[in-house]
Amino acid sequence: IPGSDMNPYLCMAAMLAAGLKGIEEKLELPPAYSGDAYENDTDNQIPKTLRDARDALMSSKMLNEAFGKETVQHYARAAEWEIEEFNKVVTDYEIMRGFEKA
């Protein structure tokens, strides 16, 4: 499930690569899922954080083969930068909690 900031060209390329891989390997589609996909407790769980998504990208054999390791590493590093920048920010919760403890 892509975010609103996804690159539509990369997203489409990834979907096409996955579809072609499925056709080539004659993979069966899993049964349709209903309910909250983020609460799915199967092995095919949707990443809940950018770090989880980055890890899934880096460990995807299919995407590394389709895009090449260099491309995957580039986008993984971009995600890591985003994570590092986010971790530098003091959130409203942290500020509020700090005042509560003071």
Each model region followed by its residue ranges:
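Catalytic-core signal marking the mid-to-C-terminal active-site face
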Residues: 1-102
